[in-house]
């Protein structure tokens, strides 16, 4: 097991290994819907890809909340969305594009498919299954099992835009500060940034990557080591630590991570991002955190010193 998590620098050149090819392959057949489920981060990335390719009429966003997973309502909500899709003209089938959250929570996707009222095939992908599954090969097998097409989904209808997740807004906000922005994630969540517009091309962000075994064994210590090493090379004043859906669902010990980093001389300001909330919510919380952050040498408002004094005088 690694002593430090894999740390990757955000790049606008592309997300996961198969992220660009799998949706395109599904949309080649005009009667198939791609139903994207998971946190806002997961669904937003696929929404942007559908918009770029002119395939929004073949895209079904199914974002779920942390409460949906925690209360066991995810399968129920997904089944309801697919039953709605079954009533749309021209829909011959659905590829349910499952996320890490469904894998982690063991959502009963087979039951969802049975209740949909139309042919549904499940594609598992993402960092938690990449070690053991070949998504490209599985997709080809899945596509071969659909009945022959009898029509196409008409153009003209499109879902409402999927909002960017909280950490997207916070990462953008931190670009103007002397911060080392770090996203704690299993690895696939930056697709919602990668597939955006040109404004994200120079985004300064580093993020972790874990597989299923590393997450199962506990990865807080590895995260601390990875962040500490990255921060040491960054030359920045503090680490802006953000989270995403999988660390949130796992109940990762952010407090312990923050304390361990502080012991190693890394100033950390944690932003309570989950990937489930929207960017405006994340920015609102971030501004509140920045406005009240107390450093040892004094009180800072929006990262600027209000006055210079000793901590004992406050």
Per-region residue spans from a language model:
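An N-terminal assembly and electron-transfer interface module characteristic of large anaerobic redox
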Residues: 1-314
């Amino acid at each position: 097991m690694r002593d430090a998590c894999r740390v990757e620098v955000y790049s606008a050149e592309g997300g996961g290994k198969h992220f660009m090819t799998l949706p395109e392959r599904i949309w080649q057949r005009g009667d198939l819907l791609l139903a994207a489920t998971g946190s806002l981060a997961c669904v937003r990335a696929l929404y942007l890809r559908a918009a770029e390719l002119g395939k929004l009429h073949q895209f079904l966003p199914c974002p779920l909340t942390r409460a949906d997973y925690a209360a066991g309502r995810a399968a129920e909500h997904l089944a309801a969305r697919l039953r709605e899709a079954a009533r749309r003209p021209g829909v011959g089938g659905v590829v349910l594009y499952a996320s890490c959250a469904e894998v982690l929570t063991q959502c009963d996707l087979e039951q969802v498919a049975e209740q949909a009222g139309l042919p549904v095939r499940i594609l598992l992908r993402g960092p938690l299954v990449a070690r053991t599954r070949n998504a490209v090969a599985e997709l080809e097998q899945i596509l071969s099992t659909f009945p022959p097409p009898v029509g196409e989904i008409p153009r003209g209808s499109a879902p409402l835009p999927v909002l960017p997740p909280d950490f997207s807004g916070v990462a953008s906000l931190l670009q103007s500060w002397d911060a080392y922005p770090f996203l704690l994630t299993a690895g696939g969540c930056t697709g919602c940034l990668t597939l955006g517009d040109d404004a994200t091309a120079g985004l300064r962000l580093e993020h972790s990557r874990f597989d299923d075994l590393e997450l199962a064994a506990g990865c807080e210590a590895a995260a601390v080591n990875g962040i500490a090493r990255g921060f040491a090379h960054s030359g920045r004043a503090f680490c802006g630590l953000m989270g995403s859906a999988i660390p949130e669902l796992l109940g990762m010990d952010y407090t312990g991570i923050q304390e361990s980093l502080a012991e190693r001389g890394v100033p950390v300001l944690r932003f309570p991002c989950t990937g489930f909330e929207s960017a405006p919510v994340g920015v609102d919380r971030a501004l509140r955190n920045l406005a009240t952050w107390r450093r040892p040498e004094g009180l800072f408002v929006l990262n600027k010193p209000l006055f210079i004094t000793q901590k004992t005088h406050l």
